[in-house]
Design a protein with these regions (language model features):
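A phosphate-binding catalytic loop at a beta-strand-loop-alpha-helix junction
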Residues: 157, 161-180
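CN hydrolase (nitrilase-like) catalytic-core segments centered on the catalytic cysteine
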Residues: 2-89
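Generic helix-packing signal
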Residues: 70, 94, 165-168
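Catalytic P-loop NTP-binding/switch module of NTPases
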Residues: 86-151, 155, 159-160
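Catalytic cores of large soluble enzymes that bind and process phosphate-bearing ligands
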Residues: 4, 27-30, 146-157, 169
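A sequence-level detector of short, solvent-exposed, charge-rich linear segments
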Residues: 31-35, 65, 97, 109, ...
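Short acidic (Asp/Glu) and glycine-rich catalytic loops that position anionic groups and cofactors
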Residues: 15-18, 137-141, 173-174
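Domain-wide signal for the mature, well-folded portions of proteins, strongly enriched
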Residues: 1-3, 77, 97-100, 167-172
C-alpha cells in the first residue's frame, strides 16, 4: 500500500511528495497519470515536486517536475527542463474532498480496518493578503450539477426513490397505495 494511501486513510487531505525521480523517455506521461490516479484513489490533493536542473549530473537528468492534482484532476504543472526555479500554484478544495470521503462508503470502509497510527497533526493559519485572487474558478454549488447532468441526476434520484418505494410496497404486501 503506498504511503500516501495510508496517510489519507489516517486523515491527510493533501499529500506532498518530494522526489528525486530522473527523466526517461515516456516517463513524464506515466508520472502525470500516476499522480492524478493516486489523488483520485486517495480523494486528496497531491503536490509533487521533483529535483531539477541543479541536481542533474553526467549520469542522471532531472526535469524539475512540479505537479498539483486534486481527486484525479490535474490542476497545475510546471514547465520542465528549465534552468530557473519554478513555482506552481493552485487551490485544493479540502471541503469538497472531505465531503467526497464521507459519502464514499469504500473509502470509509477502508479506513475502518487500519491499525491506528500516531499521525502528526500540523495546525496552521492561512493569512489572506489584500488583492488575493484564486487561480481557478470555484463552483459555488459543487454538489449540484447543471444542464444535462442535472436532468440525469434528478432522473436517477427519482428512479432510486421509485425502486425503494416499490420494494417497501412488495414487502408490506400492499394491494394499493396513495402517493402524494
Amino acid at each position: 500500500v503506498p504511503p500516501s494511501s495510508l496517510l489519507t486513510m489516517e486523515g491527510a487531505n493533501i499529500i506532498f511528495n518530494l522526489s528525486a525521480s530522473n527523466e526517461l523517455i515516456g516517463k513524464h506521461a506515466y508520472l502525470r497519470s500516476l499522480i492524478c490516479q493516486q489523488s483520485a484513489r486517495c480523494m486528496a490533493g497531491y503536490v509533487y515536486a521533483s529535483s531539477g536542473f541543479g541536481e542533474s549530473s553526467t549520469d542522471l537528468v532531472f526535469a524539475g517536475n512540479g505537479i498539483i492534482a486534486e481527486n484525479g484532476n490535474l490542476l497545475a504543472e510546471s514547465p520542465r527542463f528549465t534552468m530557473e526555479e519554478q513555482l506552481v500554484i493552485s487551490e485544493i478544495d479540502i471541503e469538497t474532498l472531505q465531503n467526497d470521503r464521507q459519502v464514499n462508503t469504500s473509502f470509509m470502509y477502508g479506513t475502518s480496518g487500519l491499525p491506528k497510527e500516531k499521525a502528526q497533526v500540523v495546525d496552521f493559519q492561512v493569512r489572506i493578503s489584500d488583492g488575493f485572487s484564486l487561480t481557478r474558478p470555484v463552483d459555488p454549488h459543487p454538489f449540484t450539477p447543471s444542464g444535462e447532468a442535472l436532468k440525469e441526476r434528478c432522473e436517477e434520484i427519482f428512479h432510486i426513490q421509485v425502486a425503494g418505494l416499490a420494494k417497501r410496497l412488495v414487502h408490506a404486501h400492499a394491494q394499493t397505495a396513495v402517493v402524494g
